[in-house]
Amino acid sequence: MEKQKTMRRRLFSYLLVLLLLGGGCAASHKSLDQRIFDVNRGTETTLAKVLPQLKKDRVILVGEHHTDENHHRMQLQVIRMLHEAGMKVAVGMEMFRRDSQPELDLWVAGKIDETAFEKIYDANWSFPWSLYSPILLYARDNRIPVIGLNVPSDITRQVARTGYQSLSEDQKGYLGNVACRVDKEYMDFIRQAFGGHGHGDMNFLYFCEAQMVWDTVMAVTALDYIAQHPDTVMVILAGTGHVRKQAIATQISNRATIPLTVFLPEVPGSIEKDLVDNRDADYIWMTP
């Protein structure tokens, strides 16, 4: 019975991949025709036309609303396009903690079956496996490294409640002793991206510190990986609040001069071509 359940789950995951990609060469062609708004030029373009630029990048950030299947389909399109163009690709994911890297490596090597890996996923992330399984199955089947970027949630919760200064030396050491300096510009960005949060200035400051720690650790982890793999481009998948240029991208640029590109999905009322500029993103995925 358990074997049958595993087979059904695997079949469902592969069917979902096919549905999201549309199948075969036609799917690849359709993906390249995806409408994109070029924020810098103020014009619409397609994924195919931006590919030459993406080939020059070391990091490509692709944002999401975690529960939106269309956003995950777009993320997979970018990964697949780069892989099929012959580039060495790694996928950095907010959805996994850094200490889950041994299990991620086993998954990509094909040494953990889907049932076992789904449990590892569930221990890291609270959203349904079906939302991310097409990306993770594609990575496994094509031996594309998956890199955990996230910080343990108990640390970010503690910072949000009582501030960065409340962390122990061991906790700070786990984070790589990253600095946490929140300025007015970053606080204004957080207000815009997350709608305020907190009750009172001190709580909001702590919330900003938690986001800063989160963004910084993900950026440093990505930089460490690409420094060790100079022929690889990393595609970072994270929520839109982390992918806006003021977040992970800024923390990367503060530490290294490397070419990178930021994609945000179109979200009516918050992420639209008339509501963002090149301080937020380079491209906006247009809603199909």
Positions of predicted regions on the chain:
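Compositional signal for N-terminal targeting/processing segments
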Residues: 25-288
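Bacterial N-terminal signal peptides
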Residues: 14-23
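Bacterial N-terminal signal peptides that target proteins for export
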Residues: 4-12
